[in-house]
């Protein structure tokens, strides 16, 4: 794989909002994201289309996308854990879907209660939904530089996951 360009994604909205003990008002989230867009961020992970029961702080993902002042210079992305989330993301007119797994089996199991293979299998359905709706998919790999449970992750494992992403037609890793 020849890397031609590295793009940095601002994940503060999604990662930060989900970490708050209290649920922030949707209009406050929209305001923060609008300021990030205005500041020139080109790729922003605005939320996640996860079950509202799992992470109530992100239950308003679709409403955020309805109200953000979109800018052609900013790609609005969100984490999508499953096909149901992918369908919600399509309905919300998300610019880009992000899927993720952990390179280490133990971390992936603790994080999403799936093996790496099970996660990859689920991503195929998400990729199909995204493809039918012309939405690009980005594949993220957690614990790529080390796992708190297993230590170093072999480079071969990262290459295998990256190759699976490529075979599914993902736009990047």
Indicate where each model-derived feature is located.
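N-terminal small/glycine-rich loop or linker at the start of catalytic domains
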Residues: 1-21, 98-111, 132-149
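Conserved N-terminal beta1-alpha1 strand-loop-helix module at the mouth
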Residues: 2-49, 57-63, 67-73
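Short, well-ordered coil/turn segments that N-cap beta-strands
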Residues: 4-6, 40-42, 70-76, 94-95, ...
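Active-site mouth loops of central-metabolism enzymes
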Residues: 11-28, 74-83, 110-116, 143-156
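Conserved, mostly hydrophobic/aromatic
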Residues: 16, 36, 89, 97, ...
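Glycine-rich, proline-tolerant flexible connector loops at the mouths of alpha/beta enzymes
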Residues: 42-67, 100-114, 143-150
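Alpha-helix-loop-beta-strand connector modules within alpha/beta enzyme cores
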Residues: 54-78, 117-139, 160-164
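Catalytic cores of alpha/beta
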Residues: 82-93
């Amino acid at each position: 794989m020849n890397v031609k360009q590295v793009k940095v994604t601002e994940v503060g909205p999604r990662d930060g909002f989900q970490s708050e003990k209290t649920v922030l008002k949707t209009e406050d989230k929209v305001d923060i994201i609008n300021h990030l867009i205005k500041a020139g961020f080109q790729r922003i992970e605005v939320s996640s289309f996860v079950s509202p029961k799992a992470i109530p702080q992100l239950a308003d993902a679709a409403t955020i996308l309805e109200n953000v002042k979109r800018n052609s210079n900013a790609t609005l992305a969100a984490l999508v854990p499953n096909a149901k989330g992918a369908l919600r993301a399509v309905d919300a007119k998300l610019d880009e879907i992000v899927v993720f797994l952990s390179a280490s089996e133990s971390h992936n199991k603790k994080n999403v209660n799936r093996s790496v293979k099970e996660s990859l299998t689920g991503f195929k359905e998400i990729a199909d939904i995204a493809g039918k709706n012309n939405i690009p998919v980005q594949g993220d790999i957690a614990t790529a530089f080390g796992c708190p449970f297993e230590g170093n992750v072999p480079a071969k494992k990262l290459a295998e996951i990256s190759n699976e992403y490529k075979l599914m037609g993902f736009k990047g890793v």
